[in-house]
C-alpha cells in the first residue's frame, strides 16, 4: 500500500493528536464551574410578612429574601476578588442585586459564599473574579428564583395517578419541581419524576400561587401510591427518602400531606392515625433541623375502590384533631370533590381533570389562608 507519510513525521503527528486529546479535558477542567444554585431552582424565602402590602412598602423587604448559597470551582481556588449580582429576566418579580463583593471560603476543592437575594424571579445569577478592573473569570446560571417551596408527601392522590397530565401555564414557567434523586430542578409539568406515570394537582396549584405570591414556586414530591401511615414509619425506606429529599432541598415553607385512603382500607383508628402522623412529623423535623407546619388534607374518599363511611370518618376525625395540634395546620377537605371530580372505572380512578384543578384550588385556599394567619397564632405551634 502506498503512503505519502514519512515515518518520523507520522509519529510526530500521532503524538500531536494524542496531546490535543489529553489537553482538551485539561482545558475544560481549568474552566470555573458553578455548582449551586442550578437552573430552575427555587430557594425558600424568609422574612416574608404578608400583612404588609407591597405597595405600602415599595422599598422595604416585607416580601422576604434568601441568603442563597453559592458553590463553584476555580482552578487556583483564590478566595479574594469574587463578586456576584442578579439580573431580572423578562417579566420578573423582585429586585436586582448589583455587583456585591463576596466573602469566600475554600473547602473540599470548592469555593463557597452566599448572596442575599430579594424574593422574586426569574433572575440570572452572575459571578465574576476581578483582578483590579479586569474580569478574569465569569460564571452565570438562569433562571433561578427566591420564593415558596413545598414538600409534598402522602399517597396516590398526591402523586401521578390522576386522569390528566397537567402542564404549567404560568407564562414564565415559574412553577418547578425538584428531581431530588438526580439533584436537578425541572419545570413542574406532569408526569413528575418518581410519583406515578400520569397527572397531579401541583402544576395547577403553582399556576394559582405564582401571580398572587409574586414569586416562583417549587415543589418537592415524595408521595408513594397505596401507602398508609404505617408505610411511612420512621424506620422505613419511604421515610428515609422523604428525609433525604428534605435535606437536599434545605428549607421549605410547609409539608403538604395528602393521604388517608389506605388507612381507610386497613381500618386504622383515629387514635392510631393521629399518633403515627405526630411521630412522623416530629422525627422528620428533628432530622431536618426545621420547624415548619404540616398541612394534612382530609383525603379519604376513593369511590371506585371502596365505600366505607365508618372508616372514612375515623380518618377524617383524626385529621380534624391534627388541624388543632401544634405543628399542624388545616389543609383542604378534598373529600368535598365527588361526582364529576373523580375518574370512573375506565380511568386512573382518582381525580378527573376537573377534579385535579378543583383540588388545586382547595390547596390554594389552605396555603393562602395559612400564609395570612395572624401573627399571634404562630405561638400556638411552639
At which residue positions do the language-model features occur?
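Exposed, low-complexity/repetitive linear segments and helix-based recognition motifs
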Residues: 11, 27-28
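Bacterial N-terminal signal peptides
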Residues: 14-24
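Cell-envelope and extracellular/periplasmic
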Residues: 30-382
